[in-house]
Amino acid sequence: MHADTLDAMLHHELPHAAAGCQQAYGRIVTACQNTVTAIALAITRDVAASEDIAQEAFLRAWQRLAQLHQPASFLPWLRQITRNLARDWLRSHRHRPLSGEAADLAIAMAADPSPSPAEQALQVEEERAALEIMSALPNDSREILLLYYREGQRSQQVASLLGLSDAAVRKRLSRARATVRNELLQRFDTFARGSAPGVAFATTVTAATMLAAPGTASAAIALGGIGSLGGVGKLGASGLSGSALTSGSAAGALSVLLGMPMAIALLAITGVTLTTYMSGAYLLRFATTAREAAAIRGFTRLSTLTAALTCGAPLLLRAFGAPKWLALCVLAVGMSVVCYHTLGTLPRIMQPMLERDARRRGTTRPPLLYRCMFSRSAIAVSLAAVIVPIAYRYGVLGLV
């Protein structure tokens, strides 16, 4: 995006974003994501960490948009948030040696789903060359060099994004070029463009803004600390699970069926609907194409509706005086549909994405967090949490 176009877009979209419009903020994220990830990558020299840091920077800015009075101050402010987060990450990882693992992961993220061994070897070599360049340059030169290649080799655009003069950018570019060989610069060009964030990055950040409106603190709670999820994104783990969906879908109905107050039921319905929607935000972390993201969003909408109906229908039946056995039957049907979606539909959608993610990580299994959230055993545990109270209440006590 041209510098003048970016400035005009920020002036137009920032007031809407500050008013709580997630779509407007999503467009801002898309326009600025190259800049923010480049700054983080220049400091950390770790592609996965740079994307995590960039996500948190965007979300912190979203939370504090009310503090911003001039649209022209947004980019400098966002850059400073990013640098502070990246330096915090660097301090917490100062004793961690740089190794080939980060390079392999970065290349895999930029690679096709199934590269040949020859392509993989070439990509790893490009990544190593890029790391060699980054290690030889100061932070400011890394930022400029990364953005220069990501923004189509336009120094004026880089100057606008980093708040520098074009002359200063050209001077630092010249100094950086003098430090490295032309062959390495060509490899760095490939790395810089290949490691740039894609569609899924902006989609994930926009989805995370649903957790809280600007000016509240709940997004910070959901995000947690940098790296706390081992590279699975900054959406947090609490409640984002198929097991929470399964047990939560029944919680509202059970609270009334087992004689608990209606307020608890309404709270459970609200919680499970939000939980289901948030689970889609976590799953979007695995999507790398618009089609994959659309499939996950479709599953999320369907699951949210199913969960709400599973909670609400038994409550309505009881409110209108229907017998408990009928409400329990409706609950059982709803739970069956929820389980079908979680154990049938979701694995079909996620299988190619999980396989690609496993290849990137050099393993054959989904991430531990995903297994804890969406595996058959997790669903079985949540089902037991529903069945046991029913069996106790209506079996042991002999109630009808």
Curated annotation (Swiss-Prot):
Keyword Chloroplast: no
Gene that produces this protein: rfaY
Function: Sigma factors are initiation factors that promote the attachment of RNA polymerase to specific initiation sites and are then released. This sigma factor is involved in lipopolysaccharide biosynthesis and pathogenicity.
PROSITE patterns to which the protein is assigned, alphabetical: SIGMA70_ECF
DNA-binding region(s) in UniProt: 165-184
Source organism of this protein record: Xanthomonas campestris pv. campestris (strain ATCC 33913 / DSM 3586 / NCPPB 528 / LMG 568 / P 25)
Protein name: Probable RNA polymerase sigma factor RfaY
InterPro entries assigned to the protein according to its UniProt record, in alphabetical order: RNA_pol_sigma-70-like (IPR039425), RNA_pol_sigma-70_dom (IPR014284), RNA_pol_sigma70_ECF_CS (IPR000838), RNA_pol_sigma70_r2 (IPR007627), RNA_pol_sigma70_r4_t2 (IPR013249), RNA_pol_sigma_r2 (IPR013325), RNA_pol_sigma_r3/r4-like (IPR013324), WH-like_DNA-bd_sf (IPR036388)
Residue window of motif Polymerase core binding: 62-75
Gene3D superfamilies to which the protein is assigned, alphabetical: 1.10.1740.10, Winged helix-like DNA-binding domain superfamily/Winged helix DNA-binding domain
Record keyword Transcription regulation present: yes
Family assignment from sequence similarity: Belongs to the sigma-70 factor family. ECF subfamily.
GO molecular function annotation: DNA binding; sigma factor activity
BP GO annotations: DNA-templated transcription initiation; regulation of DNA-templated transcription
Transmembrane segments: none
Key words, A-Z: DNA-binding, Sigma factor, Transcription, Transcription regulation
